[in-house]
Amino acid sequence: MLVLANYFPILVFLGISLFIAVLALTMGWFFGPRRPDKAKLSPYECGFEAFQDARLPFDVRFYLVAILFIIFDLETAFLFPWAVVLRHIGWFGFWAMMVFLAILVVGFIYEWKRGALEWE
């Protein structure tokens, strides 16, 4: 039987961490100076005046490629521990990972067919 009392210190640690983070953000927001001027709002470029506007919009395809990379990078992060314990988890663990990989392959094929990976 799982005893949940063993997890109480972790819960206390997470609660205190959340409290300190919120307290620090709140104090910075309340007590921080709010005097923006032209120099503070301008981009810094090695001590020189900016040659062009530094706040150029990025193409949405960059974000799409980044999101796809994160998704498939997490896949490999799950594959390494699975490969280490495969002998101990048996056939159920094997087929569970095969279902996981099948879902990812279907998602990859969907993105490929939609043209998300083509760069024009």
From Swiss-Prot:
Pfam families: Oxidored_q4. It catalyses: a quinone + NADH + 5 H(+)(in) = a quinol + NAD(+) + 4 H(+)(out). The keyword Transcription does not apply. Its EC number is 7.1.1.-. It comes from the Bacteria. Keywords: Cell inner membrane, Cell membrane, Membrane, NAD, Quinone, Translocase, Transmembrane, Transmembrane helix, Transport, Ubiquinone. It is a multi-pass membrane protein. It is found in: Cell inner membrane. One of its GO terms (molecular function) is NADH:ubiquinone reductase (non-electrogenic) activity. One of its GO terms (cellular component) is plasma membrane. The chain crosses the membrane at residues 10-30, 65-85, 89-109. InterPro entries: NAD(P)H_OxRDtase_bac/plastid (IPR023043), NADH_UbQ/plastoQ_OxRdtase_su3 (IPR000440), NDAH_ubi_oxred_su3_sf (IPR038430). NDH-1 is composed of 14 different subunits. Subunits NuoA, H, J, K, L, M, N constitute the membrane sector of the complex. NDH-1 shuttles electrons from NADH, via FMN and iron-sulfur (Fe-S) centers, to quinones in the respiratory chain. The immediate electron acceptor for the enzyme in this species is believed to be ubiquinone. Couples the redox reaction to proton translocation (for every two electrons transferred, four hydrogen ions are translocated across the cytoplasmic membrane), and thus conserves the redox energy in a proton gradient. PANTHER family: NADH-UBIQUINONE OXIDOREDUCTASE CHAIN 3 (PTHR11058:SF9). This is NADH-quinone oxidoreductase subunit A. It comes from Coxiella burnetii (strain RSA 493 / Nine Mile phase I). The gene is nuoA.
